[in-house]
Curated annotation (Swiss-Prot):
Top-level lineage group: Eukaryota
Record lineage: Eukaryota, Viridiplantae, Streptophyta, Embryophyta, Tracheophyta
Sequence segments annotated as region (Disordered): 99-125
GO terms classed as biological process: defense response; jasmonic acid mediated signaling pathway
Free-text function comment from the UniProt entry: Non-TIFY functional repressor of jasmonate (JA)-mediated growth and defense responses. Intrinsically resistant to JA-induced turnover, probably due to the absence of the canonical degron that strongly interacts with COI1 in the presence of JA-Ile in the TIFY/JAZ proteins.
Species for this entry: Arabidopsis thaliana
GO MF annotations in UniProt: transcription corepressor activity
Quaternary structure and interacting proteins, as annotated: Monomer. Lack of homodimerization, and very weak or no interaction with AFPH2/NINJA and other JAZ proteins. Interacts (via EAR motif) with TPL. Interacts (via jas motif) with MYC2.
Keywords noted in UniProt: Jasmonic acid signaling pathway, Phosphoprotein, Plant defense, Transcription, Transcription regulation
Name this polypeptide is given: Protein JAZ13
Induction / repression: Up-regulated by mechanical wounding, and methyl jasmonate or coronatine treatments.
Transmembrane segments: none
Biased composition (Low complexity): 112-125
Domain remark from Swiss-Prot or TrEMBL: The jas motif (82-103) lacks the canonical degron LPIARR that strongly interacts with COI1 in the presence of JA-Ile in other TIFY/JAZ proteins. Contains 1 EAR motif required for the interaction with TPL.
Length: 125
């Protein structure tokens, strides 16, 4: 493939139709590389291009690599949630305080003797 340019000179077909057509007929005579029309929808615009097969393959390869990079960028990275850590810390603190309160809780002397007899009499009714 001597003399075959792999440079991707893309321009809309309407503006360079005549020059591309002349280039493709020269290529048809000198080698087996043929020019084909391709419609490209990219960034919300539809364009027509007159390309040789090698250029189309290069475009497809570049687009697939671009898509792979984009897909990798969109993969969510799961990190330890800061919310989960703070919730764990909060629960731990709550349980420690509750344990301290339960240990420090003592019954008063007035409450134990007088209420036990009155509460038992209430249950007899």
């Amino acid at each position: 493939m001597k003399g075959c340019s792999l440079d991707l000179h893309l321009s809309p077909m309407a503006s360079t139709l005549q020059s591309c057509h002349q280039d493709s007929t020269v290529n048809d005579r000198s080698s087996t590389i043929r020019s084909k029309e391709i419609n490209a929808f990219y960034s919300g615009r539809l364009s027509e291009y007159d390309l040789v097969e090698i250029q189309m393959r290069a475009i497809i390869e570049m687009a697939s690599k671009d898509r792979e990079v984009t897909a990798l960028e969109l993969v969510p990275v799961r990190l330890e949630s800061p919310l989960g850590c703070s919730v764990k810390r909060s629960v731990k603190r709550f349980l420690e305080k509750r344990k301290k309160r339960s240990k420090s809780f003592t019954l008063t002397p007035n409450y134990t003797s007088s209420t036990s007899s009155s509460s038992s009499s209430l249950h007899n009714f």
